Amino acid sequence: MEKIIVRGGKRLNGTVRVEGAKNAVLPIIAAALLASDGKNVLSEVPVLSDVYTINEVLRHLNAEVVFENNQVTIDSSKELNIEAPFEYVRKMRASVQVMGPLLARNGRARIALPGGCAIGSRPIDQHLKGFEAMGAKVQVGNGFVEAYVEGELKGAKIYLDFPSVGATENIMSAATLAKGTTILENAAKEPEIVDLANFLNAMGAKVRGAGTGTIRIEGVDKLYGANHSIIPDRIEAGTFMVAAAITGGDILIENAVPEHLRSITAKMEEMGVKIIEENEGVRVIGPDKLKAVDIKTMPHPGFPTDMQSQMMALLLQADGTSMITETVFENRFMHVEEFRRMNADIKIEGRSVIMNGPNSLQGAEVAATDLRAAAALILAGLVSEGYTRVTELKHLDRGYVNFHKKLAALGATIERVNEKVEEVKEQEVSDLHA
């Protein structure tokens, strides 16, 4: 079993560079299927297990995909298959993002119902609502969702009941080849939506208003391969901001975009963290004492749900009572029990978590319950007494590139080991970076 073993007590200092955004690259790779002429070349692509998975989905759909040196080249000019099977989709719910492009290109798509992190139900009903509004017929059964259209998709006015990021992306992609104009209202506003729109426009689409609540997509007859650079990962940047703050360290986070981090920055400054915008990125200096705050996750530009668990780790070190309320996903508090194993004073009340601090955390063996929880448990381990062993690293690998190595370079006492091979002695870990 692979584990990350971390010993607490080190202030982290230095420089770290964030990768291209996981939440941007996956829908962009899926949208590359829309190009029936030429090759798409994507740069700043992070080397993540989810990227390998979506690439395999595209290959199964008959696209040619080459991934090397943080660059993905995609040729989808051949006739595409219409089915994304369970063996791929079960690993990652973002696989459902191929549905819109397939429906637009082929008039038909058959996708296994998605997997990914076990965070509530996370239904795809808003995706399907959009496809139906554009003239598609949708059937769900036997573990698959199938959509087909006679002729071609037609532009429509679509109102999302919730500003779902995935639904906004999928509908926006499908609408690029629809006949007429699609107006998508109550659309998600995340930076990753803007990045996808920029990529679609580079291919020849006509998308306007991305980043606002109303997006207009004027359909075109054909899309072409293009070059595109993926935006930096704001969630990885936020995670390293917490690493600096929680250890009282001083970290320059290169390649971070300050405009994408406003809600995170606001809450951390409220806690007493010093944040300086520099030409290279964002510098974060942790205080001697953290102040308690309340946080409510919201769609962008509100506080991102993907930073909830990391901030929970930070608030466990704050002086006073803090509360985090989760409004985006249900059942995203599974990591609370793992924090309790580390001696945290923390409890769940409905859709909120109450924390009393500061906590003297104790190292323990804990299991990552999802991607961001994996990072949060490691962050908590940075300030725990003794050794923290984090298992279920498959979650971590879905969203972070060499996370333990980046932390080690900043001064953390941390190692990733495979205990199938041999039991790792605590002394061996304590000797790291001595």
From Swiss-Prot:
InterPro entries found in the cross-reference section: Enolpyruvate_Tfrase_dom, Enolpyruvate_Tfrase_sf, MurA_subfamily, RNA3'P_cycl/enolpyr_Trfase_a/b, UDP_GlcNAc_COvinyl_MurA
Active-site residues, Swiss-Prot/TrEMBL: C117 (proton donor)
Cited SUPFAM superfamilies: EPT/RTPC-like
Chain sites annotated for binding phosphoenolpyruvate: K22, N23
EC supergroup of this enzyme: transferase
Keywords carried by this UniProt record: Cell cycle, Cell division, Cell shape, Cell wall biogenesis/degradation, Cytoplasm, Peptidoglycan synthesis, Pyruvate, Transferase
A single BP term in Gene Ontology: cell wall organization
Sites where the protein binds UDP-N-acetyl-alpha-D-glucosamine: R93, R122, P123, I124, D125, Q126, D306, V328
CDD domains cross-referenced by the UniProt entry: UdpNAET (cd01555)
A Pfam entry, by short name: EPSP_synthase
Keyword field contains Zinc-finger: no
GO molecular function: UDP-N-acetylglucosamine 1-carboxyvinyltransferase activity
Localization per Swiss-Prot or TrEMBL: Cytoplasm
NCBIfam families in UniProt: murA, PRK09369.1, PRK12830.1
Assigned protein family: Belongs to the EPSP synthase family. MurA subfamily.
Name of the featured protein: UDP-N-acetylglucosamine 1-carboxyvinyltransferase 1
Gene name of this polypeptide: murA1
